[in-house]
């Protein structure tokens, strides 16, 4: 949930008055990441270890999530699916772990688990007419400071090495934006 997509989803949920549970890989920075995600609007922040279902119950979070979003795959997706309400969809949009999730048959039968894939490129190809309005809506939220994405800016011509070093940092929580000086070309 501390990825850029996760941060945006948390903020959109907050704007829509939906509760969100942020699940993050614990890379030793939970004490910093947890409070940050809460300021963005996360209702709960959990480390992606052990039983997420038991953690939610321990925190008195009794409503089961109605939607899961996963970009990690493997056991992380299995733990996430275990928390979901019956028939609630788990949407997978990536597999950063490089491992396919493998669910027990009981998830499929008794919980009527639904797993769906999401491919942004395919969605954009089939929804070309919706994209300008969607981007305009997002831009309005950004301009109104209701949607924030953390980033660090570097000048392409003079700070490329610093940007590359920053990109290689483990546990980095910001996106890197390379700025290009005006080259005199108008489009």
Predicted features and spans:
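Aromatic/hydrophobic pocket-lining residues that form π-stacking "cages" and hydrophobic walls in ligand
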Residues: 9, 138, 163
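N-terminal Rossmann-like NAD(P) cofactor-binding module of classical short-chain dehydrogenase/reductase
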Residues: 66-69
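Short amphipathic alpha-helix with an adjacent loop that forms part of the alpha/beta core around
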Residues: 51-63
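Flexible cofactor-recognition loop at the NAD(P)H-binding site
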Residues: 50-51, 74
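Mid-domain Rossmann-like dinucleotide-binding core that forms the NAD(H)/NADP(H) cofactor-binding site
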Residues: 1-50
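C-terminal capping/lid region of NAD(P)-dependent oxidoreductase domains
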Residues: 62, 145-152, 161-187
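Glycine-rich phosphate-binding loop and adjacent beta-alpha segment
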Residues: 16-18, 33, 75-146, 179-187
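Conserved beta-strand scaffold positions in the cores of enzyme catalytic domains, especially
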Residues: 44-45, 115, 153, 175-177
